[in-house]
């Protein structure tokens, strides 16, 4: 999953900091 911490990707909120 690409995004920041607590970033909502589409409808999948996550707490993974993968940039």
Curated annotation (Swiss-Prot):
One of its GO terms (biological process) is proteolysis. It catalyses: Preferential cleavage: Tyr-|-Xaa, Trp-|-Xaa, Phe-|-Xaa, Leu-|-Xaa. Its EC number is 3.4.21.1. Inhibited by the chymotrypsin inhibitor LTCI. Keywords: Hydrolase, Protease, Secreted, Serine protease. Monomer. This is Chymotrypsin LT_CH 1. It comes from Lumbricus terrestris (Common earthworm).
